[in-house]
């Protein structure tokens, strides 16, 4: 499950699929994808990955591990339309929502932060202080190319 349909989110959907993951859906809050048309075709359409526009995650399910998310469509103001709720089973939630480290969820989870980078503090395996919770990509620090994010996550 991926939130964000800019080029990085689209390319990560393809990369994760090529690595053996089943990407169930890419959700985008906006009424359009921020990615290039060719990336939508080559990264989603060619792999049968659905893109849901005007859609957001309203709930994350699971205790020790993520077990799924509840999605909902949003209205013109970006507020969830509760009558459109849909559960999506998944064991991973990838946030691809911009080039500035997005750490609101990281901080709320109690993950220690690295003062120098403004991102999550991790060990050599990219595991945070919470056992089983790993961080990579722009949640650690800004990357210039999605290839570097993929390399870091490997």
Regions found by a protein language model. Give the residues of each.
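Residues forming the flavin
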Residues: 1-154
């Amino acid at each position: 499950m991926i939130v964000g349909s800019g080029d990085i989110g689209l390319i990560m959907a393809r990369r994760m699929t090529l690595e053996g993951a089943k990407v169930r859906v890419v959700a985008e809050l906006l009424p359009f994808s921020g990615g290039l048309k060719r990336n939508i075709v080559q990264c989603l359409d060619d792999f049968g990955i659905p893109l849901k526009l005007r859609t957001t995650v309203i709930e994350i399910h699971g205790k020790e591990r993520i077990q799924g998310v509840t999605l909902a469509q949003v209205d013109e103001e970006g507020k969830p339309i509760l009558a459109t709720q849909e559960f999506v089973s998944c064991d991973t939630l990838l946030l691809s929502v911009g080039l500035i480290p997005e750490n609101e969820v990281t901080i709320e989870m109690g993950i220690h932060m690295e003062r120098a980078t403004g991102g999550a503090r991790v060990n050599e395996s990219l595991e945070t202080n919470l056992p089983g919770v790993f961080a990579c990509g722009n949640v650690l620090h800004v990357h210039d190319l999605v290839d570097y994010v993929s390399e870091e996550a490997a």
